[in-house]
């Protein structure tokens, strides 16, 4: 079983916490992580691109000249694609880029990035993040006590609203509830700060 140091908010060590190897001791699978990140980034795309085809262009309902007898090429509409200001052929239309990967694949990807954080010594366990009021200054002090000064993902338990509010406007800090953890945010962070209760909720959901 893997164990990491458990810290208090003031930065002093409060013993060790044992991690479940079924969640934090998995051999990282880069291919699965790549697929999961690709899926998440695809679902983030707006997909609102659009062009006007000949039916969406204004005008063009009348045949510009008669079919025969003029010596000119036959035309049916001034909004045909070959005309200036005509419609676009096979242009992009609004669509969703999102797709789903199997649940087992997503779970393995999440376990892989969590396990990689442990291997990189980038996981910081805190016994709790308790604040009297949701003050950003107090949250920054805790991060300084933990020697965390890089891009950080903080995982808190579901009912810790004050911690979620205290750090939400820090530029290099993202705070998520334990149930909202995802592959992209974990992989994109340099440090992963997790409370004791959030660890328990993670292991309960993924083990």
Curated annotation (Swiss-Prot):
Keyword Electron transport applies: no
Compositional bias segments (type: Basic residues): 51-71
Annotated GO MF terms: rRNA binding; structural constituent of ribosome
Keyword entries, A-Z: Ribonucleoprotein, Ribosomal protein, RNA-binding, rRNA-binding
Disordered: annotated span: 45-78
Aminoacyl-tRNA synthetase found in the keyword field: no
A Pfam family of this chain: Ribosomal_L4
InterPro entries for the chain: Ribosomal_uL4, Ribosomal_uL4-like, Ribosomal_uL4_dom_sf
GO cellular component, one term: ribonucleoprotein complex
Single biological process term from Gene Ontology: translation
Function: One of the primary rRNA binding proteins, this protein initially binds near the 5'-end of the 23S rRNA. It is important during the early stages of 50S assembly. It makes multiple contacts with different domains of the 23S rRNA in the assembled 50S subunit and ribosome. Forms part of the polypeptide exit tunnel.
Similarity remark: Belongs to the universal ribosomal protein uL4 family.
Assembly mode: Part of the 50S ribosomal subunit.
HAMAP family (alphabetical): Ribosomal_uL4_B (MF_01328_B)
Annotated protein name in UniProt: Large ribosomal subunit protein uL4
């Amino acid at each position: 079983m893997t164990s990491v140091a458990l810290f208090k908010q003031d930065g002093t060590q409060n013993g060790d916490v044992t991690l479940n190897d079924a969640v934090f001791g998995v051999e990282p699978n880069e291919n699965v992580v790549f697929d999961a990140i690709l899926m998440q980034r695809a679902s983030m795309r707006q997909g609102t691109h659009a062009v006007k085809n000949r039916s969406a262009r204004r005008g063009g309902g009348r045949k510009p000249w008669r079919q025969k007898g003029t010596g000119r090429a036959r035309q049916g509409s001034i909004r045909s694609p070959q005309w200036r200001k005509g419609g676009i052929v096979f242009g992009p239309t609004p669509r969703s880029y999102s797709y789903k990967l199997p649940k087992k694949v997503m779970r393995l990807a999440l376990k892989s990035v969590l396990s990689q954080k442990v291997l990189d010594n980038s996981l910081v366990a805190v016994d709790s993040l308790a604040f009297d009021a949701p003050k950003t200054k107090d949250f920054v002090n805790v991060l300084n006590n933990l020697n965390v000064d890089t891009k950080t993902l903080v995982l808190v338990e579901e009912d810790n609203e004050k911690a979620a509010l205290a750090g939400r406007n820090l530029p290099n800090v993202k705070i998520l509830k334990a149930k909202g953890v995802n592959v992209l945010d974990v992989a994109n962070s340099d440090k992963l700060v997790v409370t004791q209760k959030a660890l328990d909720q993670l292991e309960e959901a993924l083990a």
